[in-house]
């Protein structure tokens, strides 16, 4: 049996998640927590399926699309460690530097 993978969130990814929650809460406060729960549940699936995201735009990363939401979780897999680098809206202009 494989070792349990560990997921960690970069500080900027945690801030991204907070910003997503705040933005959704502007129009639909009740939907904001549901959206965060959906994102976090999808990220937890990476423990079992670390390659489920497509190859990322940045070398060495993968991108997990969170459906039905339009958010993309950028992450890296290093052995049994999965680092969540960013959480971005699919339609937003991505920052010049992801990592």
Where would I find each of the regions flagged by the language model?
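Generic structural signal for secondary-structure transition and capping sites
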Residues: 22, 29, 44, 48-51, ...
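Outer-membrane beta-barrel domain signature
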Residues: 11, 35-36, 43-48
